[in-house]
Amino acid sequence: MALSAAIVLAAGEGTRMRSNKPKVLHAFAGKTFLNRVMDSVAALNPDTLAVVVHFQAERVAEAARSYDEQVTIVNQDDIPGTGRAVQCAMAQLTEAGKVDGPVLIAASDMPLLDSETLHRLVEFHTASGNGATVLTTILDDPTGYGRIIRDSEGNVLRIVEQKDANSSELAVREVNT
């Protein structure tokens, strides 16, 4: 399995943490969220490792570079959102000729996401021939998570954030991780 790139999304402010420090720079069991996720994606040996930054961009970029001097830093513009972060990264990497195969996208606020799970995700994606593959789970209490909305054949139609979900979507227990 050859990954052309792994993109770590680290642009968010993390306002619910009520901290002056970017959420991704908070420590969890001795390492920052960012370093934990970079460990997991780097274990897959992507050709390019990129980190998307925006809030306190220089501080986050410095932390990413201290992890890996070769990391590609992508500056997200002022248009908010996860989708926009991915657009910015894909545009920069494509323009630089760094996208010629599968691309893994990982959120930097998932410090428990391990490399084995990501490895299985990429293997599944490659074997399935999917255009995109989303890692999901089913929770007894999905409060606070984006819901996975599927069609009658089981294909993912969209991910609806809790604040935007209607009552039937709120009843869905499958969430994006």
Residue spans for each PLM region:
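Conserved beta-strand scaffold positions in the cores of enzyme catalytic domains, especially
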Residues: 25, 73, 132-134
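Glycine-centered loop/turn positions within well-structured domains
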Residues: 15, 23, 58
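Conserved N-terminal catalytic core of the sugar/cofactor nucleotidyltransferase
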Residues: 2-5, 31-123, 150
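Short beta-strand/turn micro-motifs composed of small residues
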Residues: 10, 53, 107, 136-137
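N-terminal nucleotide-binding beta1-loop-alpha1 segment
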Residues: 1-19, 49
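Conserved core of the sugar-phosphate nucleotidyltransferase
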Residues: 58, 113-177
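Short alpha-helical oligomerization interface
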Residues: 20-30
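Conserved beta-strand segments of alpha/beta enzyme cores
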Residues: 24, 70-72, 155
